[in-house]
Design a protein with these regions (language model features):
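Alpha-helical transmembrane segments of multi-pass membrane proteins
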Residues: 6, 10-18, 97-114
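Helix-loop-helix units of permease transmembrane domains in multi-pass membrane transporters
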Residues: 77-106
Length: 222
């Protein structure tokens, strides 16, 4: 397990540093927007705008976790497929399914660390400015966007691991349709009642990569 995690870390470490800086940058800028409004018109105006106009001030973050998840999957798995490393990896004296699961687990762990850092930054700042009901409104609104980032990572990993180009296209279409679910309702907290199911739905997408590996092992290649 440690060896697999180390191998994945070597491949992705510079991208992860960039992803962390970019996501924190966007989260920090969103907090500065709140600070600017609060400084110019008072905290009461921030509360009024949030309640009366359904504004959450963090709309810039909407597609950032999605892009981070997509790019992580590409950085992690495209070299494996391009250099034919996956075939060698799957012939190591180690359970194949467990190896792929560990590679995906690595990606999930580093994404969760990155996204948790975003949440920590936003929470620490907003606790000093907004009432708990208001900053929890923002945090719950952005949660589906971060779940979309995790789902995007798992779905693009599935596409990258697929050994045939025809299935690449089909898997891409399916992935776009599945990811669309995370962005159907633009209103703040629109997904609150659905969040547990959305989290389960996100984790279940990990099983799709097993289908690609089964096809790879069966010799399905272009």
């Amino acid at each position: 397990m440690n060896a697999i995690f180390y191998k994945e870390w070597i491949k992705t470490r510079w991208y992860l540093l960039l992803a962390l800086l970019v996501t924190l940058g966007f989260a920090g800028y969103s907090m500065l927007r709140i600070n600017r409004v609060a400084s110019m018109k008072g905290v009461e105006h921030v509360w009024e705008v949030m309640l009366a106009r359904d504004t959450v001030f963090v709309d810039l973050l909407e597609f950032i976790p999605l892009l981070v998840g997509i790019l992580l999957a590409l950085v992690q798995f495209v070299p494996e497929m391009h250099h034919k490393c996956l075939k060698l990896t799957l012939h190591l004296p180690y359970p194949q399914l467990r190896m792929i699961n560990l590679m995906l687990l690595y990606g999930l762990v580093v994404l969760l660390i990155c996204f948790a850092a975003n949440y920590l930054l936003m929470t620490v700042y907003m606790q000093g400015v907004l009432a708990p009901e208001l900053y929890s409104r923002i945090l719950l609104t952005v949660l589906p966007w971060y779940l979309a980032g995790i789902a995007a990572y798992l779905l693009i990993s599935w596409i990258c691991l697929e050994p045939t180009w025809k299935r690449h296209v089909l898997n891409l279409v399916i992935s776009v349709l599945l990811l669309r679910i995370f962005f159907l309702a633009p209103a703040p907290e629109a997904y609150n009642a659905f969040l547990p199911w959305l989290a389960i739905y996100t984790l279940l997408t990990a099983s799709l990569s097993w289908l690609s590996i089964a096809r790879f092992k069966a010799g399905e290649q272009d």
